[in-house]
């Protein structure tokens, strides 16, 4: 079974990036899935702790060969010039044995504007900075929250897919925030 780690809404935070890369190295995950808003903090957000987008790009480039990424609403062509993995696709798909993960940032496709999905597929998105791991109707919804600018009183968080279970995990203490089994 494929093991994936998900990080969203880094927004140029070097401490968050360092922690994500530390956990990725320890996790045994094959891929680090970045769900957009990689380098820029955006006009609606305050600067995250340790805002250093060029350093974040350098650190992420060290694992570029293990990154799958999608473009967020704060990502631009200029950001792509610093990164050694593609970030300009509005969505990607990861095919599992019996279902697919539809990866998107959440500003184009999301819970209120679903792409065409089949029963048991998983909508994986960021953008809201709010953790979600649940089944809604025939599909699963998964948002790992934000590693740098958490909202809704939640801690900074990331996601894991391991043994057909999607988990949102607190970045600081590894506690489980939300979890859903996706085996059809």
From Swiss-Prot:
One of its GO terms (molecular function) is phosphoric diester hydrolase activity. Binds 2 manganese ions per subunit. Phosphodiesterase activity is 25-fold lower with Co(2+), whereas other metals do not support the activity. Pfam families: Metallophos_2. The keyword Hydrolase applies. Optimum pH is 8.5-9.8 with bis-pNPP as substrate. Its cofactor is Mn(2+). It is an enzyme of class 3 (hydrolase). PROSITE patterns: UPF0025. Signal peptide: none annotated. GO terms for cellular component: cytosol; protein-containing complex. Mn(2+) 1 binds at residues 9, 11, 37, 129. Its EC number is 3.1.4.-. Hydrolysis of bis-pNPP is significantly inhibited by sulfate and phosphate, which may mimic binding of a natural ligand. Mn(2+) 2 binds at residues 37, 73, 105, 127. Keywords: Hydrolase, Manganese, Metal-binding. Belongs to the metallophosphoesterase superfamily. YfcE family. Shows phosphodiesterase activity. Shows significant activity toward bis-p-nitrophenyl phosphate (bis-pNPP), an artificial substrate commonly used to detect phosphodiesterase activity. Also hydrolyzes, with lower efficiency, two other artificial phosphodiesterase substrates, thymidine 5'-monophosphate p-nitrophenyl ester (pNP-TMP) and p-nitrophenylphosphorylcholine (pNPPC). Shows phosphomonoesterase activity toward p-nitrophenyl phosphate (pNPP), with much lower catalytic efficiency. Homotetramer. This is Phosphodiesterase YfcE.
């Amino acid at each position: 079974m494929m093991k994936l780690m998900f990080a969203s809404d880094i927004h140029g935070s070097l401490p968050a990036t360092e922690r994500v890369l530390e956990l990725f190295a320890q996790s045994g995950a094959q891929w680090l899935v970045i769900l957009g808003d990689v380098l820029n903090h955006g006009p609606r957000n305050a600067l995250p702790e340790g805002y250093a987008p060029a350093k974040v790009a350098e650190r992420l480039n060290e694992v570029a060969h293990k990154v799958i990424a999608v473009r967020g609403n704060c990502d631009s062509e200029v950001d792509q010039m610093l990164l050694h993995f593609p970030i300009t696709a509005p969505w990607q798909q990861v095919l599992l044995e019996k279902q697919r993960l539809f990866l998107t940032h959440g500003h184009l496709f999301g819970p209120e504007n679903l792409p065409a999905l089949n029963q048991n597929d998983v909508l994986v998105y960021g953008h809201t900075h709010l953790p979600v791991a649940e089944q809604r109707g025939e599909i699963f919804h998964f948002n790992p929250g934000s590693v740098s600018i958490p909202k809704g009183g939640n801690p900074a968080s990331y996601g894991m897919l391991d043994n057909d279970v999607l988990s949102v995990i607190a970045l600081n203490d590894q506690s489980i925030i939300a979890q859903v089994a996706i085996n059809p």
